[in-house]
Amino acid sequence: MIFGLCRCQLTLDAMTLFDNMSQCDVGSWNSTISGLAQNSEGKNELFLFKKMRLEGAEVDVMTMSGVLSVCADLAALVNGKQVYGLVIKYGFELYLPVGNAIIDMFAKWGCMEDACQFFMNMPIKNVVSWTSLIVGYGKHGLGWEALEAFDEMERTGIVPNKIAFLGTLYACSHAGLVQKGWGNFDTT
């Protein structure tokens, strides 16, 4: 019900319903947090996450990946570092959605060394992991690094998606490597 209200952009009604619940489980917390995120209410989402922690509610993979994404989008470094600390404390970094959110967060902050280091230590990677790294390189003018990551992704057998191609082309255009970027489209 809460998530449905949020999907209809009735976040105030969703919050009222949530606040009037006698008991909240991790699912109701996650639905509310996720619903707020869908409506670009990141600050409210962070407030709700803090409330969740203060009330001693359980967190899970969905909670952490969602909150990390908000920290990335808001460029909320202090909050993001605190959430990252919780992720490590609870061992959630081993879960692919959380790991991908961490790479994306570091990349959006411009911390490409941290993004790359975390990426290298991930036990499992998928196209989202690789694409987050490639797009991060592109946003920060690191065209050669984006190309190397793209090539390595293909060598590992992961099939690039449209976002990976666009991220590579974007990276190349910002680094003056447009012809090299188009080469990825010709060979794939």
Label each PLM-derived region with a short phrase.
Residues 1-188:
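Alpha-helical tandem repeat RNA-binding modules
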